[in-house]
UniProtKB/Swiss-Prot annotation:
Cellular component GO terms held in the UniProt record: extracellular region
Species annotation: Calliphora vomitoria (Blue bottle fly)
Coiled-coil positions: none
Modified residues (Leucine amide): 16
Record-annotated disulphide pairs: none
Family label: Belongs to the allatostatin family.
Tissue expression per record: Brain, subesophageal ganglion, retrocerebral complex, thoracico-abdominal ganglion, peripheral neurosecretory system and intestine.
Official protein name in the record: Callatostatin-1
Keyword annotations of the record: Amidation, Cleavage on pair of basic residues, Neuropeptide, Secreted
Function: May act as a neurotransmitter or neuromodulator and play a role in the integration of information within the brain. May be involved in the control of visceral muscles due to its ability to behave as potent inhibitors of peristaltic movements. May also fulfill a neurohormonal role on muscles of the gut and heart.
GO biological process, one term: neuropeptide signaling pathway
Main location: secreted
Keyword Secreted: yes
Compartment(s) of residence: Secreted
Length: 16
């Protein structure tokens, strides 16, 4: 899921 990927990215600090 793209939303899950976005949450994952935010967790890494990409801040999508």
């Amino acid at each position: 899921d793209p939303l899950n990927e976005e949450r994952r990215a935010n967790r890494y600090g990409f801040g999508l």
